[in-house]
């Protein structure tokens, strides 16, 4: 809602029309910036959506929602990613009894990995404590947002993960994309592509058995469009072949294999 907390009620009204359960995650634009301290910084959010930290169980997976935006009144920026002592007590109590063989999905707003080289964006000590609590679990999916880009992080020793299970963080793109910026179309809607070229839209998590699948859906493009291709539209015959073809695969990981071929030719790695 971009700091306009009066829109919370309208968001609920629109979401209700979709007739599906919603688990709301608080973000930095949901803060009461006139609050005197962190403890009271989500009073408006809680009044509309309920608790900011809770667990939700399904037969396929267990879900935990965390408010990881620590409000720092008077500072710039006025928040940092992290967790509070009360949240750690909740996590310790809940995770002790949760089924360790089921997928555990943790949703928060600020990414658990560091997004800036200039400063700490998520408190490292809090991440270390959280990851210690997650060690007994076989499969953990972290869902984060905030960056208005998309990325996948496989946590390991470099990011304080020392468990035997898989710890995958998906930093999801935004419905508003690049803050509703860019050239407007005939209907007046901005291009809204994010910094990494991903179009605005939404992600879908599908859980089946012991595995899950993540897909990105463009808000206004073909529903199955998984990438954008960038190549010259016209090539002069006999010209020096100094051109490039770029593929922006919206849900790619660092180890994703992307190949290209021309007509019925051989596939070549990109």
Stretches with model-predicted labels:
Residues 26, 102-118:
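Active-site segments of SGNH/GDSL-like serine hydrolases
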């Amino acid at each position: 809602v971009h700091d306009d907390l009066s829109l919370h009620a309208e968001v609920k009204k629109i979401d209700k029309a979709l007739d599906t359960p919603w688990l709301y995650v608080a973000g930095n634009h949901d803060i009461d910036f006139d609050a005197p301290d962190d403890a009271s910084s989500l009073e408006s959010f809680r009044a509309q959506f309920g608790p900011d930290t809770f667990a939700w169980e399904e037969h396929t997976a267990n879900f935990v929602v965390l408010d990881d935006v620590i409000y720092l009144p008077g500072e710039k920026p006025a928040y940092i990613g992290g967790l509070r002592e009360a949240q750690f007590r909740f996590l310790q109590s809940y995770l002790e009894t949760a089924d360790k063989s089921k997928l555990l999905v943790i949703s928060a707003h600020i990414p658990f990995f560091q997004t800036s080289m200039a400063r700490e964006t998520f408190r490292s000590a809090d991440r270390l404590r959280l990851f210690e609590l997650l060690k007994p679990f076989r499969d953990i999916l972290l869902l984060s947002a905030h960056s208005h880009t998309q990325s996948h992080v496989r946590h390991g020793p470099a990011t304080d993960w020392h468990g035997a299970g898989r710890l995958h963080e998906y930093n999801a793109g935004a419905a508003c994309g690049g803050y509703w910026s860019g050239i407007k179309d005939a209907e007046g809607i901005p291009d809204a592509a994010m910094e990494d070229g991903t179009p605005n839209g939404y992600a879908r998590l599908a859980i089946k058995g012991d595995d899950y699948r993540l897909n990105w859906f463009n808000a206004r493009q073909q529903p199955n469009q998984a990438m954008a291709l960038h190549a010259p539209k016209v090539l002069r015959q006999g010209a020096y072949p100094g051109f490039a073809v770029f593929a922006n695969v919206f849900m790619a990981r660092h180890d994703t294999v992307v190949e290209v071929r021309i007509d019925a030719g051989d596939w070549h790695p990109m």
